[in-house]
Amino acid sequence: MTCYRGFLLGSCRRVAGGRAALRGSGSGADGRRHLGHGQPRELAGGGSPADGGFRPSRVVVVAKTTRYEFEQQRYRYAELSEEDLKQLLALKGSSYSGLLERHHIHTKNVEHIIDSLRDEGIEVRLVKRREYDEETVRWADAVIAAGGDGTMLLAASKVLDRLKPVIGVNTDPERSEGHLCLPVRYTHSFPEALRRFSRGEFRWLWRQRIRLYLEGTGINPTPVDLHEQQLSLNQHSRAFNIERAHDERSEASGPQLLPVRALNEVFIGESLSSRMPYCWAVAVDNLRRDIPNLKGLASYYEISVDDGPWEKQKSSGLNLCTGTGSKAWSFNINRVAAQAVEDVLHIARRQGNLTLPLNKDLVEKVTNEYNESLLYSPEEPKILFSIREPIANRVFSSSRQRCFSSKVCVRSRCWDACMVVDGGTSFEFNDGAIASMMINKEDELRTVILEQ
């Protein structure tokens, strides 16, 4: 169990404080790309002004699980000593001292956040992933994610109240980019951030999120926490069990609103494809060893965009992102390399008898302009869906490999598929299940913009 000064994780001890209110309103803004550390320059001038300031009376601090803590928990049943853990990590090529150093840096910065809040008379609860639940969110006036972007996604996942602010603080700027966090200067100067909050010297950023409905036959709306449990072998080998028991959920059910909102993205695909970008490599390696016939099945589904006609597709999966997520996995799925742009320009010049001057500057300019067109403001109420490696033949087609939309519906024809939300929460999504994804203003996430 990790100890922070004044707190013992698991006990959720509180620090007494005063009472205050939150004030503010939101409106839309455009943005382009992330630059530097912390919040992106694209947000400069964006968001909406704070109407006065805000000073929360009760704050929950969600601290990330460091790699050192993860390794400890991973082998907790073996009752390893610190020396045993050191030797085990060495066998895997990992540095025990390096992990411990990063852990201490994170812990020190979390303590700085807690002390800063306590000095302002604010009640604080410090929790880890396992203690972070709906009751804790209801108790708090604001949520602080102490870690990196992954911790910010975790903190946001439980907040369904659009008026409750969620603030990210990067606790290890040397190892974490922290796009969704405050600028890194506030990691060590958090009292200054609190003063600026109370004076209203910031802007609100209302990040759009995707809500999900699940309906059809054989659905299971129970979420699986990938970080805590890692998807079990039994769950994903079920489709290959010839003597599979009768599914009691075979009858069709109406639309059910799932208890999560996607801040970055939703990925839909066969389980191996859906897991690889998010889970630890060891889990994937274990699956491959235990189920050798699972070698990356193509995902088979039908898709309808903005209530249009259904289209059958096979691909490596489907990614649906928000403006926040357009800078993450979606960007890397769709971005083009300068080499590809140069080849296309060569062909265009040859086929069109053009006198286009092909030089490095032109190639770089065209490449950057195309890639920047893939990004859009976190406040824009639209979804960008992308088809990964679509299969095109006389049976299957992909009329739009990438497109903006307000609503996307997917009917699964998969055998062992998952619908993964922000890389941390998974839902079964097998044959007969239908997912509907859309943007709703009620799901906005209230975050802040602070200048450097």
From Swiss-Prot:
Task: Spell out which residues are annotated as carrying N6-acetyllysine.
Answer: 64, 327, 407
Which residue interval is the transit peptide?
1-50
- Phosphoserine occurs at which residues? 176, 377
The source's domain of life comes to: Eukaryota
Give the catalytic activity. Answer: NAD(+) + ATP = ADP + NADP(+) + H(+)
Stretch forming the signal peptide: none
Q: Biological process GO terms, please?
A: NAD metabolic process; NADP biosynthetic process
What are the GO cellular component annotations?
mitochondrial matrix; mitochondrion
Instruction: Tell me the residues on which N6-succinyllysine occurs.
Output: 64, 312, 327
What EC number(s) is this enzyme filed under? 2.7.1.23
Which compartments does it reside in?
A: Mitochondrion
What does the UniProt keyword field contain? Acetylation, ATP-binding, Kinase, Mitochondrion, NAD, NADP, Nucleotide-binding, Phosphoprotein, Transferase, Transit peptide
Report the InterPro entries cross-referenced here: ATP-NAD_kinase_N (IPR017438), ATP-NAD_kinase_PpnK-typ_C (IPR017437), NAD/diacylglycerol_kinase_sf (IPR016064), NADK (IPR002504), NADK2_mit (IPR012355)
Q: What is its main location?
A: mitochondrion
MF terms in GO: ATP binding; NAD+ kinase activity; protein homodimerization activity
Activation and inhibition: Inhibited by NADH, NADPH and NADP(+).
Positions of the UniProt region annotated as Disordered:
23-52
Family from the record:
Belongs to the NAD kinase family.
Q: How does it assemble?
A: Homodimer.
Sum up the protein's function in the record's words.
Mitochondrial NAD(+) kinase that phosphorylates NAD(+) to yield NADP(+). Can use both ATP or inorganic polyphosphate as the phosphoryl donor.
Record-given protein name: NAD kinase 2, mitochondrial
This protein's species is Mus musculus (Mouse)
Q: What is the lineage of its organism?
A: Eukaryota, Metazoa, Chordata, Craniata, Vertebrata
Please name the gene that encodes this protein: Nadk2
